[in-house]
């Protein structure tokens, strides 16, 4: 799988130049209609099924916020989200039912940003394949941007992952990631 890193590393850039490139990217990402920030919750880290997805714009407009029926029982041992019950997820739409909405909010040339874009990308593509659906432009790794990588670059530690504080929902994750993006752009 392609590694989703932004800005791309340049060996001939100093740490200060790399930081400023990251600040410029964050400022562009916060322009109206430039970026949709995606937040996801899964049943397990890395390989879990999608159970919640949200998407917001830089002005905090909520474009998507829904639970997702994983169509499989949640293993109580790996349950990460005690506030979500089987009954809540059973009545939620499936990924196949929300894919069109996700495609719509991320279309028209916008960048797709997620805190951990590599994980978000893998989850969205994996869910699309499991549903037998075409992820269209979501399958292009060049459209995705990692706010975590931008944060690491900005802090001068491009090889270190700084996690977000725990959040209660995919929407909360979007807002936390947006806050990081705003911090970077304010530099």
Task: Briefly describe each language-model feature range.
Residues 116-120, 143, 170-173:
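Short, conserved alpha-helical segments within structured domains
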């Amino acid at each position: 799988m392609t590694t989703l890193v932004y800005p791309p590393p340049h060996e001939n850039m100093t740490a200060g130049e790399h930081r400023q490139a990251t600040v410029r990217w964050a400022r562009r990402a916060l322009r109206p209609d430039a970026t949709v920030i995606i937040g996801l919750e899964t049943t397990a880290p890395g390989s879990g099924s999608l159970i919640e997805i949200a998407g917001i714009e830089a002005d905090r407009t909520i474009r998507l916020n829904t639970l997702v029926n994983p169509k499989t029982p949640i293993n109580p041992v790996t349950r990460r989200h005690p506030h979500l019950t089987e009954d809540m997820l059973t009545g939620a739409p499936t990924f196949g039912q929300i894919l069109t909405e996700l495609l719509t909010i991320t279309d028209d040339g916008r960048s797709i940003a997620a805190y951990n874009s590599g994980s978000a990308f893998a989850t969205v593509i994996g869910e699309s394949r499991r549903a037998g659906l075409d992820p269209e432009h979501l399958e292009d790794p060049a459209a995705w941007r990692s706010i975590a990588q931008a944060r690491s670059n900005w802090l001068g530690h491009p090889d270190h992952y700084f996690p977000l504080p725990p959040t209660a929902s995919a929407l909360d994750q979007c807002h936390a990631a947006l806050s990081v993006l705003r911090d970077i752009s304010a530099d």
